[in-house]
């Protein structure tokens, strides 16, 4: 009932960022429903409204959240809703630095509203933000939530640090010009699609037998169709072995080494957990939670669910 009352009320008052908008990702609804666990990426309380009542905490705590990504912001919002004093720290000046890039591929622009909505909702609840600030041992919170996320994975490949090797984020943020010459994308089907809008010589090298295996099937099918329409070359069972200034070498399923031209190589091998602060946090605080990709590199759905659960435990 409160949802039906608050939705039009907030819209009428122009508080659009305080409304949980569907971002058409299909990850929590269709994707999780196929596994028997219907939920929502944006709203982790979905289908659990009566199970999780967001009751006020018995004791008000000073809570430090390290990381202003989707998981950290959800932990902050949930903790603040329960009456805690919450401060979010992030060494970057941008909110959700890694997650921001997810909104750049075709058809995913609405994902950008997730961070802005969480930020606004946190501000309304009185959450304090200290952006561009690294945490200090001088701060003595009652509870710390480590939500430092993940960083791009860089495999030990010969030539991986060459000047012509760039990250998917560099491409998506427009920091690198990839409009000329053959481009090889190591992983990252959506990044290849993004590049193919202006460059028609794009090849994907994928180590697995198929690409886009982590994508919800209802998103994967149209994405595959667009990749074929753009005539992007896709090579699977390809293990990259060497990179130089004008080519990429890979081994196929038979162990044969093959070289293909590449003026630019996009490193989109995935991510690894980034968690340099857990031990320090535990040395200075008795109640510490590590959530999302700081535990294991994953997706926003997992990070947001983790953040919500952490907020409930405080």
Question: What annotation goes with each model-predicted range?
Answer:
Residues 60-91, 95, 130-138, 147-157, ...:
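Rossmann-like dinucleotide/flavin-binding elements
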Residues 122, 141-142, 262-263:
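Local beta-strand N-terminus motif with an aromatic residue
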Residues 1-66, 70, 75-81, 85-86, ...:
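Flavin-dependent oxidoreductase catalytic cores
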Residues 88-128, 191-238:
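Rossmann-like dinucleotide-binding cores of NAD(P)H-dependent redox enzymes
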Residues 244-248:
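Short, hydrophobic/aromatic-rich segments at coil-to-beta transitions
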Residues 1-13, 118-132:
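Repeat-solenoid scaffold signature
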Residues 13-17, 104-108, 163, 220-223, ...:
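Short, hinge-like loop/turn segments at secondary-structure boundaries
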């Amino acid at each position: 009932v409160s949802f039906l009352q608050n939705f039009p009320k907030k819209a009428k008052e122009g508080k659009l960022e305080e409304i949980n908008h569907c971002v058409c990702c299909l990850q929590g609804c269709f994707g999780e429903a196929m596994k028997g666990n219907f939920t929502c990426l944006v709203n982790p309380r979905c289908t659990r409204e009566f199970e999780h009542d967001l009751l006020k905490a018995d004791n008000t705590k000073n809570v430090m959240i390290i990381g202003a990504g989707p998981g950290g912001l959800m932990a902050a919002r949930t903790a603040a809703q329960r009456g805690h004093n919450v401060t979010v720290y992030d060494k970057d000046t941008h909110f959700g630095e890694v997650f921001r890039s997810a909104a750049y591929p075709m058809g995913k622009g609405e994902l950008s509203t997730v961070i802005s909505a969480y930020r606004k909702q946190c501000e309304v609840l009185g959450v304090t933000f200290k952006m561009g600030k690294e945490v200090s041992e001088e701060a003595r919170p009652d509870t710390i939530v480590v939500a430092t996320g993940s960083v791009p994975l860089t495999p030990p490949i010969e030539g991986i640090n060459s000047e012509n090797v760039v990250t998917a984020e560099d491409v998506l943020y427009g920091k690198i010009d990839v409009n000329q010459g053959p481009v090889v994308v190591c992983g990252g089907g959506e990044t290849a699609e993004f590049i193919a809008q202006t460059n028609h010589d794009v090849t994907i090298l994928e180590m697995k037998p198929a690409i886009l295996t982590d994508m919800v099937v209802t998103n994967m099918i149209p994405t595959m169709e667009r990749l074929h329409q753009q005539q992007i070359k896709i090579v699977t069972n390809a293990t990259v072995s060497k990179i130089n200034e004008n080519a990429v070498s890979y081994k196929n399923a038979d162990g044969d080494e093959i070289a293909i031209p590449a003026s630019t190589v996009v490193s989109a091998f995935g991510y690894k957990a980034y968690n340099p602060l857990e031990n320090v946090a535990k040395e200075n605080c008795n109640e510490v939670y590590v959530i999302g990709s700081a535990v294991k590199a994953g997706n926003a759905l997992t990070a947001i669910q983790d953040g919500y659960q952490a907020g409930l435990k405080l």
